[in-house]
Amino acid sequence: MASRIIKHFGVTEPHIIRAALLHDSVEDVPGRLAYGLMVPDEEIDDLKHRPAALQTIADMFGEDTAELVANVTNPEFDRSGDTQVQYREHVVELMHEHPEARVIKLSDFIDNCKGLNHNERPLAAIQRLARKYYPLIETMREFALAEDTPIPEQGKAYINESLDVAGERCEYYISLS
């Protein structure tokens, strides 16, 4: 994902690249990030330890990197509601408020969508992901092409083409329903 940001998006700001490398760490391994190997992650309450994980990132890589990681970290969604709708609302808010975070979220989104055909989960799970991502493709395109998105024009062209492929992949898996 970080290599796509550098090679294809044309973005080389160090704090953005660092945040791209760390983008899932607060969601996936907050306990290990905050406390090392002392406690297995499955025994740690992720929400409780996210602030400590973000502080570790700030201490090691700087506040600007930690802020970007915090921005792209998905919140805990209300499981009693529609988590896909909550995810889409979160992404739109994030993309609207944080132009630098768009760079990371766009790369992650493209990676997730284009990678559907490499996903080893059961077909039903892949279809759920396709239905989660597909409604956001045009929104992602709008934010990618926005003037305040800190990506050079050639990077925006790459994103535009990649979102076309992402849409095709999502449509394919949705059509298998």
Regions found by a protein language model. Name each.
Residues M1-S177:
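Active-site helical microenvironments for divalent-metal-assisted chemistry
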